[in-house]
């Protein structure tokens, strides 16, 4: 039986040292049994593979009519979203016969040369823009970038693709950040894998010495964490 996209992505996260199990304190103050470090994708091989995973998820979403095929540009918010947008656009072209642009924003507006807030494919009225980002915690980055996009041109944001959906409720409600963004902006938010899929996949994996990758303690803590914070 072929492994699912989520299973293969979990293997990739582990091989890249981007996924760690243990005891971590997040920015929110929550004690988490796992941590995802997007900074671990630090060479050409890893970022190319990551872009291919994003492209595969996008291709699946197009087949299921979740997002349209005629995407004009892939947008990644600075800074972490920049290599995601570039590598995803390359992978869509190379592996899925889709020629799309890439665009990202500057943290500070440039007032000379090409100028403005945006770099890459210029945004114009009517363009279909697909957002890519790593992990959503509260949706702050999306809420900051949507007004920037709309100020540039009357574009249509057709969706957002994340690497991982933490599936956690926010501090203010029992709704997850992903569901809150979908409700607020009206476009789908997809992920290559969600945290439950990651733990399900990891629970089936073994260390080189044959012992389970996830200890009984980690599995119990993961279940308790998702019971308390899961949405």
Swiss-Prot record:
<feature type="binding site">
    <location>
        <position position="137"/>
    </location>
    <ligand>
        <name>orotate</name>
    </ligand>
</feature>
<keyword id="KW-0808">Transferase</keyword>
<dbReference type="GO" id="GO:0044205">
    <property type="term" value="P:'de novo' UMP biosynthetic process"/>
</dbReference>
<feature type="binding site" description="in other chain">
    <location>
        <position position="107"/>
    </location>
    <ligand>
        <name>5-phospho-alpha-D-ribose 1-diphosphate</name>
    </ligand>
</feature>
<dbReference type="GO" id="GO:0006207">
    <property type="term" value="P:'de novo' pyrimidine nucleobase biosynthetic process"/>
</dbReference>
<dbReference type="GO" id="GO:0005737">
    <property type="term" value="C:cytoplasm"/>
</dbReference>
<feature type="binding site">
    <location>
        <position position="110"/>
    </location>
    <ligand>
        <name>5-phospho-alpha-D-ribose 1-diphosphate</name>
    </ligand>
</feature>
<comment type="function">
    <text>Catalyzes the transfer of a ribosyl phosphate group from 5-phosphoribose 1-diphosphate to orotate, leading to the formation of orotidine monophosphate (OMP).</text>
</comment>
<feature type="binding site">
    <location>
        <position position="106"/>
    </location>
    <ligand>
        <name>5-phospho-alpha-D-ribose 1-diphosphate</name>
    </ligand>
</feature>
<dbReference type="InterPro" id="IPR029057">
    <property type="entry name" value="PRTase-like"/>
</dbReference>
<feature type="binding site" description="in other chain">
    <location>
        <begin position="79"/>
        <end position="80"/>
    </location>
    <ligand>
        <name>5-phospho-alpha-D-ribose 1-diphosphate</name>
    </ligand>
</feature>
<keyword id="KW-0460">Magnesium</keyword>
<keyword id="KW-0328">Glycosyltransferase</keyword>
<comment type="subunit">
    <text>Homodimer.</text>
</comment>
<dbReference type="GO" id="GO:0004588">
    <property type="term" value="F:orotate phosphoribosyltransferase activity"/>
</dbReference>
<feature type="binding site" description="in other chain">
    <location>
        <begin position="133"/>
        <end position="141"/>
    </location>
    <ligand>
        <name>5-phospho-alpha-D-ribose 1-diphosphate</name>
    </ligand>
</feature>
<protein>
    <recommendedName>
        <fullName>Orotate phosphoribosyltransferase</fullName>
        <ecNumber>2.4.2.10</ecNumber>
    </recommendedName>
</protein>
<dbReference type="GO" id="GO:0046132">
    <property type="term" value="P:pyrimidine ribonucleoside biosynthetic process"/>
</dbReference>
<dbReference type="InterPro" id="IPR000836">
    <property type="entry name" value="PRibTrfase_dom"/>
</dbReference>
<comment type="similarity">
    <text>Belongs to the purine/pyrimidine phosphoribosyltransferase family. PyrE subfamily.</text>
</comment>
<feature type="binding site">
    <location>
        <position position="166"/>
    </location>
    <ligand>
        <name>orotate</name>
    </ligand>
</feature>
<dbReference type="GO" id="GO:0000287">
    <property type="term" value="F:magnesium ion binding"/>
</dbReference>
<feature type="binding site" description="in other chain">
    <location>
        <position position="27"/>
    </location>
    <ligand>
        <name>5-phospho-alpha-D-ribose 1-diphosphate</name>
    </ligand>
</feature>
<dbReference type="Pfam" id="PF00156">
    <property type="entry name" value="Pribosyltran"/>
</dbReference>
<dbReference type="InterPro" id="IPR004467">
    <property type="entry name" value="Or_phspho_trans_dom"/>
</dbReference>
<feature type="binding site">
    <location>
        <position position="112"/>
    </location>
    <ligand>
        <name>5-phospho-alpha-D-ribose 1-diphosphate</name>
    </ligand>
</feature>
<keyword id="KW-0665">Pyrimidine biosynthesis</keyword>
<dbReference type="InterPro" id="IPR023031">
    <property type="entry name" value="OPRT"/>
</dbReference>
<comment type="pathway">
    <text>Pyrimidine metabolism; UMP biosynthesis via de novo pathway; UMP from orotate: step 1/2.</text>
</comment>
């Amino acid at each position: 039986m072929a492994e699912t996209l989520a299973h293969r992505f979990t293997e990739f996260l582990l091989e890249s040292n981007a996924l760690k199990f243990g005891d971590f304190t997040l920015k929110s103050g929550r004690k988490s049994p796992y941590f995802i470090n997007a900074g671990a994708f630090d060479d050409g091989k890893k970022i190319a593979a990551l872009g291919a995973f994003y492209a595969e998820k996008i291709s699946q979403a197009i087949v299921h009519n979740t997002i349209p095929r005629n995407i004009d540009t892939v947008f990644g918010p600075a800074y972490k979203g920049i290599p995601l947008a570039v590598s995803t656009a390359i992978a869509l072209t190379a592996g899925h016969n889709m020629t799309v642009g890439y665009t990202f924003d500057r943290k500070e507006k440039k007032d000379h040369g090409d100028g403005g807030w945006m770099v890459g494919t210029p945004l114009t009225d009517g363009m279909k823009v697909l957002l890519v980002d790593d992990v959503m915690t509260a949706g702050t980055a999306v809420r900051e970038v949507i007004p920037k996009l709309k100020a540039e041109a009357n574009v249509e944001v057709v969706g957002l693709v994340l690497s991982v959906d933490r599936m956690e409720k926010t501090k203010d409600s029992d709704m997850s950040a992903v569901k809150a963004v979908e409700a607020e902006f009206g476009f789908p938010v997809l992920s290559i894998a969600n945290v439950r899929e990651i733990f399900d996949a990891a629970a089936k994996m073994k260390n080189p010495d044959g012992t389970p990758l996830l200890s009984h303690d980690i599995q119990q803590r993961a279940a308790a964490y998702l019971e308390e914070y899961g949405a």
